[in-house]
């Protein structure tokens, strides 16, 4: 029935700026680019940008954690692109490390380095 998470949507009232920021920060171009939604394919998942923020408290939602191989490098990379640190890299046990940053649009972006978990295609 459930196949796993497929899409994370961040709300960004300035879609053009958000598209440029995520293109540079994640190093991929959008595969879907419309005035009402921009979608990126990132490691088998979709990152969506939605400019409609009506009824949304930006940054006060569930936090999606993007899997990374080198969390120190990924964390520094996002900070260098203008993200603001929310939670520094920390070990949460079992060699699992997490961190969060806030993108320029107020969305919390989680990072996780977990040697025990491999996403299925």
Protein language model features and the residues they cover:
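Conserved short beta-strand elements that form part of the metal-binding/catalytic scaffold
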Residues: 28-62, 108-114
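Short, conserved charged micro-motifs
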Residues: 17-18, 71-75
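Loop/turn position at the start of each blade in beta-propeller repeats
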Residues: 3, 35, 94-96
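Short secondary-structure junctions
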Residues: 27-32, 85-89
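Conserved active-site tyrosine of GNAT-family acetyltransferases
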Residues: 18-23, 78, 106
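Vicinal oxygen chelate
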Residues: 75, 81-121
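N-terminal beta-strand motif that seeds the catalytic metal site of vicinal oxygen chelate
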Residues: 1-19, 44-46, 62-64, 115-121
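Short beta-strand micro-motifs in enzyme catalytic cores
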Residues: 38, 62-64, 95-99
């Amino acid at each position: 029935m459930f196949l796993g998470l497929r899409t994370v949507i961040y709300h960004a009232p300035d879609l053009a700026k958000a598209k440029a920021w995520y293109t540079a920060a994640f190093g991929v171009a959008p595969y879907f680019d419309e005035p009402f939604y921009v979608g990126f394919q990132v490691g088998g998942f979709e990152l969506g940008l939605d400019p409609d923020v009506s009824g949304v408290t930006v940054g006060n939602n569930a936090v999606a954690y993007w899997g990374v191989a080198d969390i120190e490098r990924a964390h520094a990379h996002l900070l260098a692109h203008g993200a603001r640190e929310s939670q520094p890299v920390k070990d949460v046990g079992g060699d699992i490390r997490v961190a969060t940053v806030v993108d320029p649009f107020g969305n919390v972006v989680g990072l996780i380095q977990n040697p025990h978990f491999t996403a299925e295609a």
